[in-house]
Regions:
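Noncatalytic alpha-helical scaffold of FAD-dependent oxidoreductases
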Residues: 1-460
């Protein structure tokens, strides 16, 4: 009997016959990311239901020397949620899916927190919080499919980061399974708990390379009593930055700040999304603000005093139609490229944002690359999502080199919130020194000495 067959039989004893998938038709959806750019191979897909089952699955795989790839909602954009492209003939590969781990606890209203299994979606967690009059501080365009385990593993930022911080800031406690199958539980609603290392913080952003996250205790927040959403058509990136600063100076709380371009708005309009403003401009800034008193009047006054503004529209939150212009970018971009979109998630210091944005938008004009750049992102924290359409497949690495060169020249990061995954593993040296990388490898080796968890992710 093949080693993979023996392994599959052992896994079936833990999670049941129906939850160990080996038929190619059944496993196909787990082995390709949603963009279609990354495809992998696995000897089986295991779907545990509880932390104990995850522990048993990992213990079996560890004993067999099998590689374990962890997957939540499979909405990642850097290839970290699918297995390596080729099987290792010496070691089986198991994809561990959290798709059955969707439980969400009752909300602790006094402690303002809620526990959720790794497969619970962002939207479901927020809905549970809303039942208690609270809100989940993480919000993403992929909220209906992105999962608790996924946002923790990538330390996702999202549209509310300017107000609430990244995912790591929202994690109070965590349950995880180490590479040898032992369970790690750091579960407390204490705001102050300074005993030793911050292991939940370490696992946030580790992309499944240090442990398998199974449950998370998230912080919840009180939603603003009143908020409005404005989309302003502006002449320059600096105008958008100044608008955010002016909002804060006038006593408004900036809940979200998103930047779009005319190229992006035209693209989403082609795919059925209405234009947010009647007038066109090079840039569009979406601003969601809250505050006391007549928030609409205060926001209207803010906009009226902005130089370089061609047009603006204002609606009470949640203003889904206005948000739709921003949130439909990713899907519209994916449907508009003749080749897999080169998707890069970068950040630069806000002071460098106007110049860096112009250089990145000009990548397709240099003559070196025949591509269409579409840029958008979180202007309030310097995060730009660079999307390069119609790049010849053989030039994807070259154009990525160019983009990352621009980012490095401005003192930026090659990964703002999507993680490194497989897509950026060859470029990690641009963001970390040799000593830094050695320290990261030492941590990896300490927690996963045989390097079984998510092979190829972060370190290549």
């Amino acid at each position: 009997m093949r080693a993979a067959d023996t392994l599959q039989a052992s896994l079936r004893e833990v999670v049941g016959e129906a939850n160990v998938l080996t038929d190619p038709d059944a496993t196909a959806g787990f082995l390709v990311d949603w963009t279609g750019a990354y495809r992998g191979e696995a000897d089986a897909v295991a779907r545990p239901r509880t932390t104990d089952e995850v522990s048993a699955v990992v213990r079996i795989c560890s004993g067999a020397g099998a590689r374990i790839c962890v997957q939540g909602g499979n909405t990642g954009l850097v290839g970290g949620s699918v297995p390596p492209a080729r099987r290792d003939p010496e070691r089986p590969t198991i994809l561990l899916s959290a798709s059955r781990m969707t439980d969400i606890d009752e909300v602790d209203v006094i402690g303002r927190c809620v526990g959720a299994q790794a497969g619970a979606t962002v939207a479901a967690i927020d809905a549970r919080a809303a039942q208690a009059g609270l809100a989940f501080p993480i919000d993403l365009a992929s909220r209906e499919s992105a999962t608790a385990g996924g946002v923790v593993s990538t330390n996702a930022g999202g549209t509310r980061m300017i107000r609430r911080g990244n995912t790591r800031s929202q994690v109070l406690g965590i349950e995880a399974v180490l590479a040898d199958g032992r369970g790690l539980r750091r579960w407390t609603s204490l705001i102050k708990d300074n005993v030793g290392y911050d292991l939940p913080g370490l696992l946030a952003g580790s992309e499944g390379t240090l442990a398998v996250v199974t449950r998370v205790l998230f912080r919840l927040v009180v939603p603003p009593a009143s908020a409005v959403v404005a989309v302003a058509a502006v002449d320059h990136v600096q105008t958008a930055i100044d608008l955010i600063g002016a909002a804060s100076s006038q006593g408004l709380t900036v809940e979200a700040a998103e930047l779009m371009t005319e190229a992006g708005i035209a693209l989403v309009h082609e795919h059925g999304q209405r234009r947010p403003t009647a007038s066109r401009a090079p840039f569009y800034v979406l601003l969601e603000v809250s505050g006391p008193g007549d928030i609409e009047a205060a926001t209207a006054e803010l906009l009226s005093g902005t130089d370089g503004l061609a047009d603006a529209v204002l609606e009470p939150a949640p203003a889904r139609a206005l948000w739709g212009a921003r949130e439909s970018h990713t899907e519209s971009i994916a449907r508009s490229s003749a080749t897999p979109v080169v998707k890069l998630d970068i950040s630069v210091p806000i002071r460098a944002l106007p110049e860096a944005f112009a250089e990145l938008a000009g990548v397709g004009d240099s003559g070196d690359f025949d591509c269409r750049p579409v840029l958008f992102g979180h202007v309030g924290d310097g995060n730009i999502h660079v999307n390069l359409l119609d790049v010849p497949v053989e030039r994807a690495g070259d154009v990525t080199d160019t983009v990352f060169g621009i980012v490095s020249a401005h003192g930026g990061s090659i990964s703002a919130e999507h993680g490194i995954g497989r897509a950026k593993a060859r470029w990690t040296h641009l963001g970390r020194s040799d000593v830094d990388l050695d320290a990261m490898r030492a941590i990896k080796s300490a927690l996963d000495p045989h390097w079984l968890l998510n092979p190829g992710v972060i370190f290549g």
